[in-house]
């Protein structure tokens, strides 16, 4: 498994949270190879998410999708594709 580790700036958490639940989560959960996702509440304006995919290829496709169609309520600062070393 591979994951996207995303860092974003979130200037308005309430607006971003609404977009997350109404648009982002429904779209991401339909992505090929999607396993699970976690979007963490920001500290200040800095937020992170971890979205897990079945393969590196699926994660790369997820990265490309995010780069091409980022959420409107956040500024994506970085997207890293990382191997999942373990889970419980």
Residue ranges, per PLM feature:
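Short S/T/G/P-rich N-terminal loop/turn motif that feeds into the first structured element of a domain
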Residues: 1-47, 54-65, 75-88
């Amino acid at each position: 498994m591979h994951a996207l580790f995303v860092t974003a700036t979130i200037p308005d958490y309430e607006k971003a949270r609404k977009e997350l639940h109404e648009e982002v989560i429904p779209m991401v959960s339909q992505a090929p190879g999607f396993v699970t996702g976690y979007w963490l509440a920001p500290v200040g304006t800095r937020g992170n998410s971890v979205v897990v995919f079945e393969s590196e290829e699926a994660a790369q496709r997820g990265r490309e999708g995010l780069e091409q169609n980022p959420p409107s309520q956040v500024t994506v600062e970085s997207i890293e594709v990382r191997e999942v070393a373990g889970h419980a």
